């Protein structure tokens, strides 16, 4: 198992080489306060003889540590414990409830939910384990991150991969993933596959697309993260990869990508910190350059169907020539880290724009063209800069999403041409009047109640989610025919129904189910 290194350490030379950089407790059991990570071996004293300070967060039990391990002997500050080739049999009395990460390398006994308690959210296994990891012995656990490392000695099977993980990390293993490792044998829905599957630099096997199971739903997606792995990826990954998987390549990936091609399927490809530039033939139809891409982004071929282009922390700006002609790009996303000024010529063929946590020097009132463009949709996410109508072409934008911005949203922030508006986690001007043209309105976690005057008279679809104020009939004009109701402080009743209502849908957090009987004829599950 890969162990954490630290510059501030002192080394037991009989056990470790100088490069190991472990923090080791000597026989006197004294820990200087600057150390948060400590290591215990057969030379170390018993736990109850060590004077732990409150800054100790990580403990390594190393190489034949023989003393008793009891949770009451450990400080309450501990959040991570790694067991490295210990012979002790651990029990429910061994692990404190404060521990979030447990690592086992060369552990010869079964790992069960008796040891891995509910507080543990991350688990690492590696080395010559006595038994393969068995998820059935971990029922009821809260594991969201699982790592295989340290030349893990068993085949990684479906029984080894805990269901519904957020992250599966594959490092140094004795055997590769195969077509049965991730496959859900019972076809359970939603699928039990990890949301993120990461292959790290010590992973030494090819990564074919066939090891990733096909999912019938096209709504659910998963991420494959590829770092500087030993073997280059090939076209075999993409040719056989189901469309549900997004692929991110970066983190120092050193192999050339020339021989790899993306097929025409609807696939998202992320390109980050790679050693070699990406050729045009490698790019798909949904591409993101992120996390230190240090090469010039080459122009996409003309007539290319580019549905989405996202830019993050890249070294060079895009230009007008980057975007293919004549079809342009479906959505251009400018993410946090992009540090170049946006100019109107970039947006001549951009149909949707998403801005995420960018600087005021990047996006100004002069960035977007005010006419002669096709920009119909704008999403503003986590912006900490002021904006108003002068920033946008006000006669063509029909869809706008505003999420978690610092700007107070009033009438002067909303184009009159809008037909669809989403306001999520925003502050509203008390005098806000939503444009009359809006027919689809989504509201979630706003800071003040809506009024009858603020709601457009032609509203047809109304999503009212996580609304912290009383709801009443005046919120639902008689033009509304579709309502989605989420968390509210009082129930939606028959008195609130607009005369035009056809469908009533409850979000997952609506707590006043079942609806009253008169409402059931509208209820759509």
Swiss-Prot record:
Alphabetical UniProt keywords: Repeat
Taxonomy, superkingdom: Eukaryota
Keyword Repeat included in the entry's annotation: yes
Sequence ranges of the FNIP repeats: 65-107
InterPro entries: FNIP, FNIP_repeat
UniProt cross-references to Pfam families, sorted A to Z: FNIP (PF05725)
Protein name according to UniProt: FNIP repeat-containing protein DDB_G0274617
């Amino acid at each position: 198992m890969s162990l954490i290194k630290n510059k501030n350490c002192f080394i037991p030379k009989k056990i470790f080489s100088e490069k190991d950089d472990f923090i080791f407790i000597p026989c006197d059991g004294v820990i200087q306060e600057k150390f948060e990570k400590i290591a215990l071996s057969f030379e170390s004293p018993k736990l109850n003889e060590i004077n732990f300070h409150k800054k100790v967060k990580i403990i390594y039990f190393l190489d034949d540590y023989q003393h008793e391990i009891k949770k009451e002997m450990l400080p309450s500050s501990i959040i991570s414990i790694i067991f490295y080739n210990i012979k002790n049999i651990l029990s429910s009395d061994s692990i404190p409830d404060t521990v979030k990460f447990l690592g086992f390398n060369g552990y010869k006994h079964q790992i069960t939910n008796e040891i891995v308690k509910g507080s543990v959210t991350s688990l690492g296994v590696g080395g010559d384990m006595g038994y393969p990891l068995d998820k059935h012995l971990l029922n009821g656990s809260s594991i969201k991150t699982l790592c295989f490392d340290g030349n893990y000695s068993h085949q990684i099977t479906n029984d080894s991969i805990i269901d519904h993980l957020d992250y599966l990390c594959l490092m140094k293993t004795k055997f590769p993933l195969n077509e049965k490792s991730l496959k859900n044998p019972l076809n359970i829905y939603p699928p039990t596959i990890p949301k993120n599957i990461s292959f790290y630099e010590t992973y030494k096997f090819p990564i074919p697309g066939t090891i990733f199971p096909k999912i019938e739903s096209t709504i659910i997606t998963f991420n494959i993260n590829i770092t500087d792995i030993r073997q280059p990826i090939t076209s075999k990954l993409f040719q056989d990869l189901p469309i549900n998987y997004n692929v991110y390549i970066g983190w120092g990936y050193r192999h050339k990508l020339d021989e790899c091609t993306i097929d025409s399927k609807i696939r998202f490809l992320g390109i980050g910190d790679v050693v070699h530039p990406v050729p045009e033939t490698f790019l798909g139809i949904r591409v993101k350059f992120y996390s230190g891409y240090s090469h010039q982004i080459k122009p996409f071929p003309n007539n290319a169907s580019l549905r989405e282009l996202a830019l993050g922390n890249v070294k060079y700006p895009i230009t007008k020539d980057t975007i293919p002609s004549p079809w342009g790009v479906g959505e251009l996303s400018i993410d946090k880290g992009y540090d170049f000024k946006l100019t109107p010529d970039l947006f001549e063929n951009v149909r949707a724009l998403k801005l995420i946590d960018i600087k005021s020097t990047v996006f100004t009132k002069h960035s977007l063209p005010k006419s002669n463009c096709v920009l119909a949709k704008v999403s503003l996410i986590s912006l900490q800069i002021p904006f108003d109508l002068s920033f946008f072409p006000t006669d063509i934008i029909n869809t706008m999403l505003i999420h978690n911005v610092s700007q107070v949203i009033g009438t002067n922030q909303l184009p009159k041409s809008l037909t669809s508006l989403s306001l999520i986690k925003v502050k509203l001007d008390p005098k806000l009047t939503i444009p009359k043209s809006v027919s689809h309105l989504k509201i979630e976690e706003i800071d003040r109640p809506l009024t009858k005057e603020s709601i457009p008279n032609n509203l047809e679809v109304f999503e009212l989610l996580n609304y912290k104020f009383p709801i009443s009939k005046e919120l639902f004009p008689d033009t509304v025919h579709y309502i989605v109701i989420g968390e509210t402080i009082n129930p939606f009743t028959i008195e609130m129904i607009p005369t035009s209502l056809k469908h009533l849908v409850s979000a997952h957090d609506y707590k006043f189910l079942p609806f009253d009987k008169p409402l059931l004829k509208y209820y759509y599950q």
